[in-house]
Amino acid sequence: MRTWVPLARLLQPRSRAAELAALERRLRDELAAEVDADEPALARAVGEAKLALATSITDVVACGSCASGHPLPVGQHPGGACCAGVTGELFDDDELAALAHAGTRPADLQPPARRHPHAGCAFRGATGCSLATEHRPARCVRYFCHGLRAEVHRRGQLDDLEARVATLDAAMSAFRTAHRARRDREVVAPILAAITRHLKRGATGS
């Protein structure tokens, strides 16, 4: 069977293309999972809390130069030092599931242009994150380094933003609990089914 690969990915540096392909596979697997109504509802709450926080942080300057002077890969771009992590770790199973069930689809995972070197997260570019806020992990939206905290404190916004961070953290915690409980059930279900079949065979003497 032929696998269709987006042209944009083929034009990416090999390391970024590989991370994008792995992330897309995981996202498709999560989208194919059977979930009850609670998990998508909790995921949407995470998305709403992310947007509420992100729209409250405007015109900050700390994020545009925080990586300057750092060793590679952090210092490859002037800003986004906190974005220099590994894509698969930033989009861990909980974060990716929250995105999937809030509406993120493979087509939403748009990388920066090829001219932006791959330096950390696959979506980190010279001008910032290539993803729309609703498609970013919660940890990316809620992270406040010392420089950013100092900036919003000087602007008198820190207390409000910390309250919004707490709301996002609570929403993500509730989703994480539901998601992990479902994953546990997925692991246990085949075991219980096998035990049930064994007991039935024993009862019938077959």
Predicted features, each with a name:
Residues 1-205:
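Hydrophobic scaffolds flanking metal-cofactor catalytic centers in soluble metalloenzymes
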